[in-house]
Amino acid sequence: MRHSDVPFLNDTVTMESATEILERHRALSTSFGSEPLLVLPDGRVLDLATGYIPLLSTFTTEDKAAKGLRKGKESSAPPVYFSLNDLLRDNQALLLSGPSGSGKTTFAKHLCYSIAEQIRAAYSPAVDKVPDVGAAEWDLKGLRSCYFAVDDDQDLEALVRDTLPSLFANSSASEVDGVVVVIDAVENAEQRFSSHIENILTQLLSSPNKRHRLILLSDPTASNELVVPLTVARYNIKPLSSAQRRDKVAPLMPAEAIVDIASGDSTSNPALFALAFEAKHPGDQAEVLLDAWLVKVNDADGSIAENAFHQMCMEISNASVVEPQPPGVELDWPLLARSRKIKRLLVARHLSNLSTEVAVEFFRHDPIRTAEILQSLLIRLREADDQKFDILAQALLEDDDITSQRAALLLAKAGKICAQLEDQISHQALEILREGRLPFAERQDAASVLSRFGDPRDLLVLAEIPASLVTLGSNTHVNSQPMHELPIHTFRIGIYPITVGQYATFKTATGRQWVSPDRDDPYRQNFPATDVTWHDAVAYCGWLTSRWRANGTIGEDEQVRLPSEPEWEEAASSGRNTLDLAGCLYPWGTEWRSDASNSEETGLNQPCAVGLFPKGASFHGCHDMTGNIWEWCTTLWGEGMATPSFGYPWQDDGREATEASPSLRRVLRGGCFSSGRLKANCTYRGSLEPGGYWRGNGFRVVVSR
């Protein structure tokens, strides 16, 4: 549904000038400030101007520092997160992602209101400080704003064709220093998004005015699948911290009530925070919170939830599961029931009173848009009606198709389940990873399911690399030159990087220190082990050598070790590098693929479970050779970060020495989640001090004689 008061392109027959568009949007942006946002327990309403909570991103100062490799240090200091306004200050084009209720639209409207009123950009006082990155707060002086919400490809096409050229090219009035364009719900234009965004960026970047800004807002599941140029920075919206929630509640409520209002886990979502505030409820679980709120607003007959269900059925064009509403029947929606997040919870509540057949048909009709609803329904039934839950679960899983795979992921989050259902869900999750058909976000969920239930994949399996004459290097970076040939011996290499679970076993057995926050997380045991130094990786290899010799996995004349740089490069490139190859080489070929690795282009900004990108496997069968994490090699680099002392061509000059000065850096290969395609490839050479560690570097093992 369109945002009711938001103008769209071509609302008028004649084309508007830039001045007319800006004036119309200034009036609209000013009106945003008076839109109702929060309802207090006593019924008072706070508008956007007074009720807004400034939002943060998940991007930290550590992340920014780690764009270049550096030596990591353990610290007890909490992370410092960049606000959304910090990101807008630093990036001309931005894609912000957040789930329903995360505050995307509210942020955009408050920003436009602040620009229209020329007031200071909003920062959260509950956060200790603005990140100290040598830059001032974002100055809104002289800017103008335009907010657009899109329903489909036609909306975005009209925007690109009729409005943005005028805004970016002709906004030259002396009082206009730059235009901030917000495009909300870009996932609704997913089919032709790639071509549209290229046109928008051409218009934006061709303007000499560098104060222009483009803000794209999207659901995270959709944004992970959008092909976005590197000139668009991608970030995620951080849920509200307990400090942010307390800071909003404290001035408005008696001191004794503060502890009990919006303190629960679910209220980190801004929409649920608003619900808990009005209901004067902790909000530990969304479904319990919704029921308490419905009591607060006197919905004794369930009409609010029923109406939400009818609306949703019409939205997904599934009239077969509902009775048509009598003509002229309108429900006076409470303010918070207009939120998409709250509507989905309401629909789930109504479905809990209907048959399982209706629920299955409802989900199968549109499994993407109804996923959040089914999730809430399953949680309700798990708590209240075990028999109905089991019947619904079996009905959802009876067809061995993608929809059943999606249902399995939702069932896994519903709470405690029986062993039989756990096995069925694990089977579906494994198929999701093997097939790689579902979007990346759902493959992540599948990996979390397997981590929690016990990943059945052999994550220590090795690929055999035959002896051959291999080509190393590339012409894409001076440190990878010259390209040259080198003979290598037969060896075996891990198909996957060493995982959290594998390294945790080593830590437990040896007592070695490991500061990774992932080590005890049941949902991340199949993630690559990170925050490990080169010395840690070497120690793991020695420990695994002893174990594998003892159980016969390897012979007494074989050892487990880190790969040398040539071995790593051959495992990644699979013999397809040639002396005349121009450009980058990736494990899958010479053309970049956005769906083949967890690199900067993916926008995740953190490692993911191993093996989630089957399309990116090398021809030797090795997964995650590029992106996700940097991988330690045995090879020495030198003392300087920019230029190696041990350059190419590779020589037997002591660079493979196991003992060396701690100031001599060791080679890292493959790039990580924050590396772009020019680094996340088969030939780019990185490095780090052997005592350094970070959440973006790990390792895989080699077995050789």
Segments the model singles out, each with a brief description of its role:
Residues 1-91, 97-99, 106-113, 120-138, ...:
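Charged, amphipathic alpha-helical interface modules that flank catalytic cores or transmembrane segments
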Residues 106-178:
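Post-nucleotide-binding-loop coupling segment downstream of the phosphate-binding loop, primarily
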Residues 111, 150-154, 220, 226-228, ...:
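Extended hydrophobic
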Residues 175-194:
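Conserved P-loop NTPase "ATPase switch" module shared by AAA+ and STAND
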Residues 188-210:
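Conserved Walker B catalytic segment
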Residues 270-274, 340-459:
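Hydrophobic repeat-domain scaffold segments
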Residues 479-484, 519-522, 576-577, 582-584, ...:
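Surface-exposed recognition segments
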Residues 487-597, 634-643, 703-705:
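Active-site microenvironments of metalloenzymes and redox enzymes
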